[in-house]
Amino acid sequence: MRHLKTRLSFAVAAATAAVLATSPVIAQSAADVQKAVDAAYAKFKDLKEGKNADYIPALAKVDPNLFGIALVTVDGKVYTAGDIKTEVSIQSISKVFTMAQVIQEQGLDSIAKRIGVDATGARFNSIIAIEGVRSVVGTGAPEMNALVNPGAISSTSMVTGATADAVWAKIIGIHNDSAGRQLSVLQDVYKSESDSNQRNQAIGALMYAYGYIKTDWKQAVDLYTRQCSIGVNAKDLATMAATLASAGKNPVTGKVVVDPAKVPGILAVMATAGLYDDSGKWLYATGLPAKSGVGGGLIAVSPGKFGIAVIAPPLDDAGNSVKAQRAITAISNSLGGNPYAATPKS
């Protein structure tokens, strides 16, 4: 069964590769794209559902009314609405780009064999998930992925470097290149998370004990905490999403950040595990590879068309931004963003 699941995950990757090769650039006019973005902002601006994450004290203090939308097309056009300048911590969205760094350095199999590419069926910070897969470490098919905390901490540990600073330079580097500007850590969030990350420390110790982490697990947890504390605004996140939509090339700066051949595998993991327990529901509704963060950010990728991001801190029970899900769904529907939806030929 585990091998079947792995084959299915790579089948999703193959399908995504085909989409990347054939999808046209967004067909709507610039005015229509901006209209779709503005309409979503107006419709959901006053939505009061959800609440800020509070298990990290700094996140509970973020303005719950913060709401910004940005969309960046693969030809570099930028559309925005609301607050696109205020930074929040990137949180779990960083997992995508650290995973991309590992895949860029070591190939797709590095993640598939060490961590896995399957949904765990457990919470994103579950220790039970680690216990459930420890017996299959090294078999090539662990039931884990790099977008839940255990897999993400392992992924961070796989970034190569002689020192912690050297590893960090690579991690922040791929985030900078994807966003198209120099990003920095929000020190208040980093301190808050460092003071309250006992569960992640336990996860790191277990992952080391069971062979998922082969370096200093305390360093891996610290670097993971630091990457989750990177400050980003909605435009940064949309540009990062658009870099993946554009087969690894930042459409604003023109820099190739990720090998195009490796992007489909990254999108496949986002498609199956990007929104925690609600990943299947999200993919069923939108078809978009996506990743959320408990800081209130959400990115989604329409391969070959655009990347979109929303920042809105109040979360639902699964840990995903309520406004962001609604806004991205509405905009994607208006622009035909679902990569699985084809127009029948007459």
Task: Show which residues each predicted segment covers.
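Sec/Tat signal peptide C-region and signal peptidase I cleavage site
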Residues: 22-27
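Active-site-adjacent helix/loop patches that line small-molecule binding or acyl-intermediate pockets
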Residues: 29-33, 39-42, 47-49, 102-227
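Structured C-terminal helix/loop/strand segments within mature extracytoplasmic catalytic/sensor domains
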Residues: 246-346
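A short, well-structured edge-of-sheet supersecondary motif
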Residues: 45-81, 297-300
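Penicillin-binding protein/beta-lactamase superfamily catalytic region
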Residues: 165, 194-197, 202-266, 316-321
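Bacterial N-terminal signal peptides that target proteins for export
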Residues: 1-13
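Active-site SXXK
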Residues: 75-76, 88-112, 240, 308
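Bacterial N-terminal signal peptides
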Residues: 11-21
